[in-house]
Amino acid sequence: MLMPGYSLIDKLHLKLTLWRRSRFILAGRRIMRRIGFKYVRMIEFVRPLDAPIPIIETKLKVEVRPFLTEDSENKIYDRICFTPGDNLPLHDKTLRRVASGNEECLVAIVNGEVAGYIWLLFIGTNYEPAIEIEETFAEGEGLVYQLNVFANYRKKYIAKKLINNGLSYFKSKGYRKCYSYVESDNMPSIKSFEGMGFHPSRVITCLRIFKFKRKKEANSQR
């Protein structure tokens, strides 16, 4: 008769212990956020290019085309920032990236407006600021990254269309596989990449310091 009662008490004690631990973990995370620390989890996705690429039908008529040097004078790109720190409307940083020959920016156009874009890295090294690491890609390995679809055009399969065009480009050039990096809380992007045949290969965790960085940057500007 004692054993069932003991088991019940034991289970309640275990639940209470786990609850206390979870409270400590949550409290610890809140304190870390308040002082400027944050855990960033990035998922690395990979996709072999010998697998068929799904055909995507968007809900709107979309034209996907590369951003070219002469496009810097095109009015539809005036207020669009393809690269952080771009000097609009000159797009100086974007043009340098395109001119390097290592990268290309694919732009989705809907009714004469930019709906979104995605970057392709053909060869070389990519720096991920969110997790503060550099990844070098071998010959035959490409990177599809910095996917961005503007709010008015989301849920129209435009993200998948951009990924589709990126994969098709890499496959036409004889690449073997394609990578991408997505933050673990960015569910729309995760679903888009998984829907295009990507699968997670690893999770990278980084402890970032945000408030200290901002203060440091502010002091450096004085």
What are these regions (language model features)?
Residues G85, G101, I109, E113-G142:
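Conserved acyl-donor/pantetheine-binding loop and adjacent beta-alpha core of acyl/acetyltransferases
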Residues S184-R202:
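Conserved active-site alpha-helix within GNAT-family acetyltransferase domains
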Residues Y117, K160, S201-V203:
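Residue-level detector of high-confidence beta-strand sites
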Residues Q146-V149, K155-S172, K177, K191-G195:
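Conserved acetyl-CoA-binding loop-helix of GNAT-fold acetyltransferases
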Residues C178-V182:
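Conserved hydrophobic beta-strand within the GNAT/NAT acetyltransferase core sheet
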Residues E44-F45, H199-K213:
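Conserved catalytic-core motifs of GNAT/GCN5-like acyltransferases
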Residues F150, E183:
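Residue-level recognition of the GNAT/N-acetyltransferase active site
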Residues M1-T94:
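Acyl-donor-binding surface of acyltransferase catalytic domains
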